[in-house]
């Protein structure tokens, strides 16, 4: 009988944030798959848990993933952890979860710490609709292309960023979204020096150019403001009907097409065309 996979979230800073259920799952698992076994070992030592650790990270996932699946299909239970937060979220565990589903293995996700949600809740930005964009590319061209694809995104956008890339990322964001776009920079969440700076992209660039950023950041960027739709006038309708008729359409067809294009009632377009 096949075993199970448990996705076990780990603290994003404060070790006191690990739940009793997570602790029990780690204790009862046959082995633990970890992104960095050195980081996970520190947590296990803190919890007083001795367990077999298997490394699973970006550069060995193709080989190790199959081996882990084989062990679970043979009846063992695996707990998957990342260095911090919920596994499989912007992390190599994503591919491992896909493998397990393809193999028909039962997957159980345990709720717990997640930097995305923690940052969003404390950001002061709109929380009703949001999108998580993960880490931006280290290559400027790819980073700009990613941001440009979000030019008209109206949902709140969330990104992870390292301190050494922060200023370059903020500069690209300002170039694409505008310097006045609101942003909340959430740093060292749940740790001793936790900080949330709610400002604009332009002001953030000034702040972190003068003061070198430290710690890991979650950037919560306000979405694009909703654009006001222009309402077509009777003159617009009359001009468009005339143009379409000059192109060969009958008056009836020109009125019908104009009404559709300008989102106006046919009778309004008809009256405008007769003026």
Where does each model-flagged region fall?
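Short active-site oxyanion
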Residues: 26-32, 104-108, 156-157
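A contiguous loop/helix-start segment that scaffolds small-molecule binding in enzyme catalytic cores
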Residues: 2, 156, 163-275
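Glycine-centered tight-turn and secondary-structure capping sites
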Residues: 92-94, 251
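Conserved helicase motor
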Residues: 55-63, 136-140
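Class I SAM-dependent methyltransferase SAM-binding "motif I" and its flanking Rossmann-like core
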Residues: 95-153
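Loop/turn-to-beta-strand initiation segments
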Residues: 3-5, 75-79, 155-156
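Glycine-rich, flexible N-terminal cofactor/catalytic loop recognition
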Residues: 1-58
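General beta-strand structural signal in soluble alpha/beta enzymes
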Residues: 34, 109-112, 159, 185
């Amino acid at each position: 009988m096949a075993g199970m996979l448990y996705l076990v979230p780990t603290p994003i800073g404060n070790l006191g944030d690990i739940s009793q259920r997570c602790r029990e799952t780690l204790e009862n698992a046959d082995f633990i798959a970890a992104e960095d076994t050195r980081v996970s070992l520190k947590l296990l030592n803190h919890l007083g848990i001795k367990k077999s650790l298997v490394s699973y990270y970006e550069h060995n996932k193709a080989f190790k993933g199959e081996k882990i699946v084989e062990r679970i299909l043979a009846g063992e239970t695996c707990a998957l952890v990342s260095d911090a937060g919920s596994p499989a979220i912007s992390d190599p565990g994503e591919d491992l979860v896909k493998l397990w589903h393809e193999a028909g293995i039962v997957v159980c996700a345990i709720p717990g710490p997640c930097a995305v949600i923690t940052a969003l809740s404390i950001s002061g930005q709109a929380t009703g609709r949001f999108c998580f964009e993960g880490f931006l590319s280290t290559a400027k061209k790819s980073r700009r292309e990613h941001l440009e694809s979000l030019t008209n995104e109206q949902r709140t956008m969330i990104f992870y960023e390292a301190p050494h890339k922060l200023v370059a990322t903020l500069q690209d964001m300002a170039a694409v979204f505008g310097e006045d776009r609101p942003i909340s920079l959430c740093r060292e969440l749940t740790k001793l020096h936790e900080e949330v700076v709610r400002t604009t992209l332009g002001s953030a660039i000034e702040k972190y150019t003068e003061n070198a950023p430290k710690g890991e950041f979650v950037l919560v960027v306000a979405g694009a403001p909703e654009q006001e739709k222009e309402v077509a006038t009777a003159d617009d309708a009359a001009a468009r009907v005339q143009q379409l008729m000059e192109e060969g359409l009958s008056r009836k067809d020109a009125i019908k097409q104009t009404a559709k294009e300008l989102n106006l009632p046919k009778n309004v377009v008809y009256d405008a065309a007769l003026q």
